[in-house]
A protein has these predicted regions:
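Class I S-adenosyl-L-methionine
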Residues: 1-29, 39
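Short acidic, glycine/serine/threonine-rich loops at helix termini
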Residues: 19, 42-45, 68-71, 94-98
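A conserved structural/catalytic subdomain of Rossmann-like adenosyl-cofactor enzymes
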Residues: 71-242
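Conserved acidic E/D residue at the C-terminus of a beta-strand in Rossmann-like folds
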Residues: 34-35
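Residues at the starts of beta-strands that form the adenosine-phosphate
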Residues: 27-31, 54, 135
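Beta-strand segments within the central parallel beta-sheet cores of soluble alpha/beta enzyme folds
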Residues: 4-11, 31, 57-59, 199-201
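S-adenosyl-L-methionine
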Residues: 44-77
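Short, well-ordered alpha-helices that flank and scaffold nucleotide-derived cofactor binding pockets
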Residues: 18-25, 45-48, 128
């Protein structure tokens, strides 16, 4: 489908967006937004080097200055078929300048994400900008699965909507700049009506040490993808429905 779209609302230098487009079995238009203008410039260069004329990168704060608006109504955010994101973990000042620029992103969840932690704010932005049959994958700190207070209220609301297809727990110390364990939330709005549970994979033990970081081997990645795609539950310690 030549009109399919994928967005990364925290695109950094654009590598995740480029890989998503490379992995798509059909032509797809890419849209990225990056807060730092220098990094946004790098993303544009990266797109050119990878011969990706179909990628648009815009600079600006995704919360206070979202760049992609509905073409027919400038007061509504544009929605995408697919979203991929590895946003900055536990962002402290995400609320700066958002007054009057919420665009309904934080409504209907029973609470607002905490002022000093933007993890759920990213998730709400993604859910708002995903089409009603859209699919997304977002990397967030493991804490989003169990932290309390406002986040617990929001989490409960999201779970009740059956938008989350699966959660993949990753090893700690995988990403540069943080030792925090992360997880991938796989969102699929299309199948929500008939979804009974969430497919959980605990991939936190499948890795190899690489200097002072941990790294997923090809076989670890293959196991995650195969288990997820085929919904294999033969080893309940590794994967099961909850």
């Amino acid at each position: 489908d030549a009109s399919a779209t994928v967005c990364d609302p925290a695109c950094g230098s654009g590598s995740l967006l480029i890989r998503a487009i490379d992995a798509a079995p059909f032509p797809i238009m890419g849209y990225g937004q990056e807060k730092e203008s220098t990094t946004a410039g790098l993303a544009k260069m990266n797109a050119v080097l990878h011969r990706k004329a179909e990628i648009i990168i815009k600079s600006g704060n995704t919360f206070s200055n979202p760049q992609y608006m509905d073409k027919s109504d400038n007061s509504v955010l544009e929605r995408f078929d697919y979203i991929v994101a590895n946003p900055p973990f536990s962002m402290k000042n995400w609320r700066d300048g958002i007054a009057g620029k919420e665009y309904g992103r934080f409504e209907g969840y029973g609470d607002m994400p905490p002022e000093k932690n933007g993890d759920y704010a990213w998730l709400m932005h993604i859910l708002k900008t995903l089409k009603s049959n859209g699919k997304a994958a977002v990397i967030l700190p493991h804490g989003v699965l169990f932290r309390g207070n406002a986040e617990a209220t929001i989490r409960e609301t999201i779970i009740k909507k059956h938008w989350i297809k699966g959660i993949i727990s990753l090893p700690a110390n995988l990403f540069y700049g943080t030792g925090i364990a992360a997880c991938v939330l796989v969102i699929d709005k299309e199948g929500a009506a008939n979804r009974q549970g969430i497919f959980m994979i605990d991939a936190s033990r499948g890795y190899v040490k690489d200097g002072n970081k941990n790294r997923l081997r090809e076989r670890d990645i293959y196991r995650i993808i195969t288990t997820f795609n085929e919904q294999i539950t033969t080893d309940p310690k590794y994967a099961r429905f909850i």
